[in-house]
From Swiss-Prot:
Component of the heterotrimeric velvet complex composed of laeA, veA and velB; VeA acting as a bridging protein between laeA and velB. This is Secondary metabolism regulator laeA. Pfam families: Methyltransf_23. Residues 1-82 are annotated as: Disordered. It is found in: Nucleus. Its EC number is 2.1.1.-. It comes from Monascus pilosus (Red mold).
Length: 367
């Protein structure tokens, strides 16, 4: 059975990395049903989210945080590009869309991460049950909502470029969007018990700068948790060169590097940047994510079914903006490549996988 590996150093090279052990914008309807907790998602029957009970807004909010979620299309109208809707605020800096398809994709990746970690824990670092938790790039808000429901005495804030979060979230959960976490914050330094970030690669120009800002906003002794996926396809029993999977990733890596927000993840650099920002007690775990259910272990097969759904929903989404903006490719060419990559992702004779990286880093009690 594949298992998790805890380590202080980055993982070994790719060959041995898989250890035995994700027009104008019309805003969502304010009366729309909220997204259901990830625990309720079923890989055998993905259905519309059930409505959940709404709550009055929290009164925990600090006046220093800023304006709450703004779903007015006149404020920062989204724009259509290649048939998808992209954010209007800071237009063009982020390569992923913000429409309904993207929101479902983000929730599926949240489920992938939960299943892969073999635990229903949402926070792995030490934390007070009544703490202040900040989620950077919260997307649909699914992690923040799950945390708020699990810890009703906590105060949870999610921030994101796009106002795609539900308005009737739990009373102890607030969202602030549009919000660019690469711009100066007004979130209160030395005031957060945990800061969380999930799948941030592809949205950050300067990780050292972001880590310094995160460090400044944590209370002494508090923790930062980051979850990333290295989307470079790997295979331990054959070369992937010459396959569409390999070609697609290399093109995606190049395009996002040209955009100054690389999707590629480098664990050695991540640990070094965290250390340079002042973090200590840095823990790094890696988990293999099979692209399809080729593995014999039943748990790995379950992870693979979820991840196959997630990655097949992501290939075209990842490709459209980078390949049209930076390579000038026509959409038809992109769709042909996407079809080839999906076919290989479904092929159980290709034992390909990606790597999930999980980091925990602590701000020292005394600097």
């Amino acid at each position: 059975m594949f298992g998790q590996q805890q380590q202080q150093q980055p993982p070994p090279p790719a060959a041995s990395a898989y250890l035995n052990h994700n027009s104008r914008w019309t805003p969502p309807n304010e009366s729309a049903q909220p997204r259901r907790s990830s625990n309720a998602m079923d890989i055998n029957a993905i259905t519309d989210r059930d409505p959940a009970e709404g709550h009055p807004r929290s009164n925990h909010t600090s006046s220093s945080i800023g304006s709450p979620i703004d779903k007015s299309p006149e404020t920062y109208p989204g724009h259509e590009e290649n048939g998808r809707i992209y954010h209007g605020f800071r237009r063009g800096i982020y390569f992923l869309p913000c429409d309904d398809l993207e929101q479902d994709r983000l929730d599926i990746f949240h489920k992938v991460i939960t299943v892969a970690r073999v635990s229903d824990a949402l926070i792995y670092s030490p934390h007070p049950r009544n703490g202040r938790f900040l989620d950077l790039g919260c997307g649909t808000g699914i992690w923040a909502i799950d945390v708020a429901q699990k810890y009703p005495d906590a105060f949870v804030v999610g921030v994101d470029l796009s106002p795609i979060q539900p308005l009737n979230s739990p009373r102890n959960c607030d969202f602030y969007a549009p919000f660019d976490f690469e711009s100066p914050w007004a979130l209160g330094e030395d005031s957060w018990d945990l800061i969380h970030m999930q799948l941030g690669c592809g949205s950050v120009v300067s990780w050292p700068s972001l880590y310094r800002r995160i460090f400044a906003h944590l209370r002494p002794g508090a923790w930062f948790e980051q979850v990333e996926i290295d989307f470079e396809p790997r295979c331990d029993d054959r070369s992937l060169e010459g396959l569409a999977l390999h070609h697609w990733y290399q093109c995606l890596k190049q395009a996002t590097e040209e955009a100054m927000r690389p999707l590629a993840h480098n664990p050695r650099e991540t640990i070094r940047h965290l250390q340079e920002a002042g973090f200590t007690e840095i823990d790094h775990q890696i988990v293999g994510l099979p692209l399809n259910p080729w593995h014999q272990d039943e748990h790995e097969k379950t992870v693979a079914r979820w991840y196959n759904l997630a990655i097949c929903e992501s290939i075209e989404t990842f490709s459209l903006a980078p390949f049209t903006r930076f390579f000038g490719w026509p959409v038809d060419r992109i769709k042909r490549l996407v079809a080839d990559v999906r076919s290989e992702a479904f092929n159980k004779d290709i034992h390909a996988y990606n790597i999930l990286h999980i980091y925990q880093a602590r701000k020292p009690i005394s600097n």
